[in-house]
UniProtKB/Swiss-Prot annotation:
A single GO molecular function term of this UniProt record: thiamine pyrophosphate binding
Binding site for pyruvate: D29, H118, E483
Enzyme Commission number, as recorded: 4.1.1.1
Name of the protein described by the UniProt record: Putative pyruvate decarboxylase C13A11.06
GO (cellular component) term, any one: nucleus
Cofactor: Mg(2+); thiamine diphosphate
Subunit structure: Homotetramer.
Pfam family, any one: TPP_enzyme_C
InterPro entries xrefs: DHS-like_NAD/FAD-binding_dom, PDC/IPDC-like, THDP-binding, Thiamin_PyroP_enz_cen_dom, Thiamin_PyroP_enz_TPP-bd_dom, TPP_enzyme_TPP-bd, TPP_PDC_IPDC, TPP_PYR_PDC_IPDC-like
Superkingdom, natural source: Eukaryota
């Protein structure tokens, strides 16, 4: 494939080659001409899917990328892109590959320094691009066609390999500049550079020796094992060694939780006591993809000895106190699978503790109330293999730790960035990615609190517009629970308008009769009846469930985390 091609057409064709089917975002005067080029890709499944606002679009791009592996969002210069920056920053923090395309004023207008609308009135057209440099792995503006293809390829390659957002600014005339199409016939380089053989062998030798000498080895899986695509290697490592394996909150769904070797969730000092004792007494910790944020570690309360630790990261390794830069964990894991002796590993593998939390009624509440310690273990029974589950910052993010997932569930949350309202936009991106995938029958399930819902509810409208069919659980507990637990238990600033008619949401947003179902559950009996309803479980239309829970009830881990956070905030 050679000859000339329009810059915008080249960009969209490359995205289509990388598996992106839907372009998210909001139209604006500086990106309209660029959007006209989407149809030139030539694939009827490659399309524009607009969002209700740019922030929701950025959240949706995050959710789409977590299911699909990559996503793209188009915004307009200044007002549009800054509306999206919170969502893009979240993707940067959480290692999610999002291509952010910004329609900018034309190159000719930029050269004049005109006081154009959507600017700060200072003639500087790179101000917003400079802002995004802090939350992007790579930033470029296409100002000519000569090297446009190479710049676009570099940006897309970095986005994928670094698993972080990139920024591509395209002036309104630049999308129609002519570029070479010759690269379209070549596959983008998406693999990490191979490790230095001598350094790699030294790392392998050290790890092998530690495994031989270990008596109580364990494996701990975290977020970056998922983000940097080593889950297949991790599964093979668990299968080979039989070592007890744990996940962090951000590592939920990284491994098969039906495995006999899955042993629970580690959250530092607020972990289940048996999990805490088992992992903190290890003499060999294989930590894969760690992202040690406060909510992911029980406010940094890990009690693990560095002298017993091997840390696997996307671009470096740490063995005990020695750092090995520029050593990619993917290749180390593949090499380990070849050199470790299975029978030797099996002889060191202790039996798991049988991690399985049962539903129980919370102290101080009636058995007719739906409490978190009852609901989340029961919710595990409702989940099916291959479900996509999105949980909101707050009670849902912590409650889901009490679920033991079926095989191949994809869990999406935002534990590090923690922007409330994220989950609704991410749900739309996720259900759209499922629709675009080879498995469009997978269920997409959202659990969101009433307070968070009020920030981003309009993206449910976009689901209805495109006939997407998520199951949406709304926790109706009268306001901001996590904030109340941290500070201001009865403060007015943690209150919201509690008079919303949740049963009216689909109809209000235009869902046709017989194309939606709504439910309100107030007791455990209501929940059990709903979960046994085959029509509900089939998810053949969009469904909204109002889940009424006590105002101050919360998952155990959240209660403990809130105490730690409150203490830190007062330091």
């Amino acid at each position: 494939m050679s000859g000339d091609i329009l810059v915008g057409e080249y960009l969209f064709k490359r995205l289509e080659q990388l598996g992106v089917k839907s372009i998210l975002g909001v139209p604006g005067d500086f990106n309209l001409a660029l959007l006209d080029l989407i149809e030139k890709v030539g694939d009827e499944k490659f399309r524009w899917v607009g969002n209700t606002n740019e922030l929701n679009g950025a959240y949706a791009a995050d959710g789409y990328a977590r299911v699909n592996g990559l996503s793209a969002i188009v915004t307009t210069f200044g007002v549009g892109e800054l509306s999206a920056i919170n969502g893009v920053a979240g993707s940067y923090a959480e290692h999610v590959p999002v291509v952010h395309i910004v329609g900018m004023p034309s190159t000719k207008v930029q050269d004049t320094g005109a006081l154009l609308h959507h600017t700060l009135g200072d003639g500087d057209f790179r101000t917003f691009m400079d802002m995004f440099k802090k939350v992007s792995a790579y930033s470029i503006m296409i100002d000519n066609g000569n090297d446009a293809a190479e710049k676009i390829d570099e940006a897309l390659s970095i986005c994928y390999k670094k698993a972080r957002p990139v920024y591509i600014g395209i002036p309104s005339d630049a999308g129609y500049f002519k570029a070479s199409s010759s690269n379209l016939g070549k596959r983008l380089k998406l693999e990490e550079d191979t490790n230095d053989p001598a350094v790699e062998q030294e790392v392998i030798n050290h790890i092998s020796e530690m495994v031989v000498n270990a008596k109580k080895p364990v494996i701990l899986i975290d977020a970056c094992a998922v983000r940097h695509r080593v889950v297949p290697e991790v599964h093979e490592l668990i299968k080979l060694t039989h070592f007890p394996t744990y996940v962090t909150p951000m590592g939920k769904s990284a491994i098969d939780e039906t495995s006999q070797f899955f042993d629970g969730v580690y959250v530092g000092s607020i972990s289940d006591p048996e999990v805490k004792d088992r992992i903190e007494s290890t003499d060999l910790l294989l930590s894969i993809g760690a992202l040690k944020s406060d909510f992911n570690t029980g406010s940094f309360s890990y009690h693990l000895s560095q002298k017993n630790a091997v840390e696997f990261h996307s671009d470096h390794m740490r063995i005990r106190y020695a750092l090995y830069p520029n050593v990619a964990m993917k290749y180390i894991l593949r090499k380990l699978l070849k050199v470790l002796d299975a029978s030797m590993c099996h002889s060191k593998a202790a039996p798991t503790i049988g991690y399985n939390i049962k539903p129980k009624h919370a102290e101080g509440y009636s058995s007719n109330e739906i409490t978190h310690c009852w609901f989340w273990p029961k919710f595990s029974e409702f989940l099916k293999p291959r479900d996509v589950l999105i949980t909101e910052t707050g009670t849902a993010n912590f409650g889901v730790l009490d679920c033991r997932f079926p095989k191949d569930v994809t869990a999406i949350s935002q534990v590090l960035w923690g922007s409330i309202g994220y989950s609704v936009g991410a749900m739309f991106g996720a259900v759209l990615a499922v629709h675009d995938s080879k498995e469009p029958d997978r269920r997409t399930i959202l659990v969101v609190g009433d307070g968070s819902l009020q920030l981003t509810i309009t993206e449910i409208s976009t689901c209805i517009r495109h006939n997407l069919k998520p199951i949406i659980f709304i926790i109706n507990n009268d306001g901001y629970t996590i904030e109340r637990l941290i500070h201001g238990l009865h403060a007015s600033y943690n209150e919201i308008n509690t008079k919303w008619g949740y049963q009216q949401i689909p109809k209000f947003f235009g869902a046709a009769e017989n194309h939606f179902r709504t439910y309100c559950v107030k007791t455990p009996t209501d929940v059990e009846k709903l979960f046994s309803d085959k029509e509900f479980a089939n998810a053949d239309v969009i469904q909204v469930v109002e889940l009424v829970m006590p105002m101050l009830d919360a998952p155990r881990v959240l209660v403990e985390q809130a105490k730690l956070t409150s203490k830190i905030n007062k330091q």
